[in-house]
Amino acid sequence: ETGLADKGIAPYEKAIALRPNEPLLLIGLASCLLSKGAAGGAANQAVNQKAIDHLRAALRLDPLNGPAYLQMSKGYGQLGEIALAQWALAEYYAAGGHPEARRHARRAIEGLPKGSVEYIRTVDILSAIER
């Protein structure tokens, strides 16, 4: 799988150079990078972080893009950032109105720094669910 992901990186980078504001291209590149970064190690930590940066860029362009949050949870999980991975899953499930959003939001809130953007978003998710 990593070999296929490696082959996808360069074409996505070329496409993004032509269309930098295309969320689906950013998500596709991030997905390839996350597959490459799944092997672990210090070098792959940087690859995973780069993937998360692309996903954040995609979400700035399309804040309700569920697949971006799903990929982000994978990236944060690979980095060992479990609370952030749970937050991303809460966002993913909340966007679809799925009841799993509550469980992931509750897990996230325990580990996120109070006052962080992700903490505030998680509180918002829980508030919306409780209504």
Question: For the regions a protein language model found, what residue spans apply to each?
Answer:
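Structural motif corresponding to the intra-repeat A-B loop/turn of tetratricopeptide repeats
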Residues: T2, K36, Q45, L79-G80, ...
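Canonical positions in the second alpha-helix
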Residues: A15, A57-A58, E91-Y92, A108
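Helix-start (N-cap) detector for alpha-helical repeat units in TPR-like alpha-solenoids
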Residues: P23-L24, G66-P67, A83, P99, ...
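Terminal, low-structured helical/coil segments at or just beyond the last alpha-helical repeat
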Residues: Q78, A94-R131
